[in-house]
A protein has these predicted regions:
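Short amphipathic alpha-helix that is part of the acyltransferase structural core
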Residues: 1-39, 157-184
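Short alpha-helical
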Residues: 15, 19, 62, 73, ...
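Active-site rim helix/loop that mediates acceptor-substrate recognition in acyltransferases
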Residues: 28-58, 65-67, 184-187, 191-204, ...
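Conserved beta-strand in the GNAT
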Residues: 55, 61-69, 75-82
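Conserved acetyl-CoA-binding loop-helix of GNAT-fold acetyltransferases
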Residues: 83, 89-102
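Conserved GNAT acetyl-CoA-binding A-motif
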Residues: 104-117
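C-terminal "cap" of GNAT-fold acetyltransferases
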Residues: 117-118, 138-187, 209, 214-241
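Conserved active-site alpha-helix within GNAT-family acetyltransferase domains
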Residues: 117-138
Length: 241
């Protein structure tokens, strides 16, 4: 939502960043243990120089900051998300997040990932629609969350649709278990009308079927002629078959 009162600055000025560092330092100094994002000042400044800092403005005041980095062409990692203490709990965080998501979508990104820091922010991220990252066998903090930014394939049954099934085990174990996730896909000459995007392990079993006939099955990383084509930033991403 961009208005005179509220908007994001995707190319903030150094003065914007300095303004934010002032209240981040004040917040850090009030904390008995000295916790706070001011301790990440070097990260903030480096990200600003790289063009990876976005500021939220309210009535021309810099009251919010996102620091991010690009994992690859589909995923954005949010390193810092913070709102001025005086403006928390008033809806500004949600406005900021949704505006930034729109910006990321415009840049072609498909998903965001972050670590809930502080832990008290977990409730906010759940409210924003993010999901706790499934255990994919990689080292991730238990408070890692992700959010999908685009419309994806249906998990609700569609008559005559092809089906993609994903197990959270390797192929040799999949014979004895049911798939953990199922998507019903529609495609136009091999390109999915809506893609599939989901956290995964590259060794998990993937099956593509039509009317009960298995068209292809195997590990995600070897599912296409080009190894790891469907595995991006520890996500399964299918836009064509």
């Amino acid at each position: 939502m961009r208005t005179i009162e509220n908007h994001i600055e995707i190319a903030p000025t150094l003065q914007d960043i300095k303004e934010i560092l002032v209240w981040l330092k004040e917040e850090r100094d009030r904390d008995i243990l000295g916790h706070g994002f001011f301790n990440n000042k070097n990260i903030i400044m480096d990200s600003f120089r790289l063009g990876n800092a976005i500021v939220f403005k309210h009535e021309n005041k810099s009251i919010g900051l996102i620091v991010w980095n690009e994992s690859d062409d589909i995923l954005v990692n949010i390193d810092i998300f913070v709102i001025h203490p005086s403006y928390r709990g008033k809806g500004f965080g949600g406005l900021f997040y949704h505006d930034v998501c729109n910006y990321f979508v415009e840049k072609g990104f498909k998903a965001v990932k972050l670590f809930c820091e502080p832990k008290t922010s977990e409730k906010f991220w759940v409210k924003m629609g993010l999901l706790k990252l499934h255990d994919c066998g990689y080292t991730e903090h238990e408070l890692t969350y992700y959010g999908v930014l685009i419309d994806v394939a249906s998990t609700i049954h569609i008559n005559n649709a092809e089906k993609i099934e994903l197990w959270d085990v390797e192929p040799y174990e999949a014979m004895e278990t049911e798939p953990r996730w199922t998507w019903y896909i529609e495609n136009d000459e091999g390109r999915l009308l809506y893609p599939i995007l989901h956290p995964c392990n590259c060794n998990w079993n993937l099956r593509w079927s039509r009317n009960g006939d298995v068209l292809k099955e195997g590990k995600i990383k070897y599912f296409t002629d080009e190894d790891f084509e469907l595995f991006k930033s520890k996500f399964l991403y299918i836009e064509k078959l």
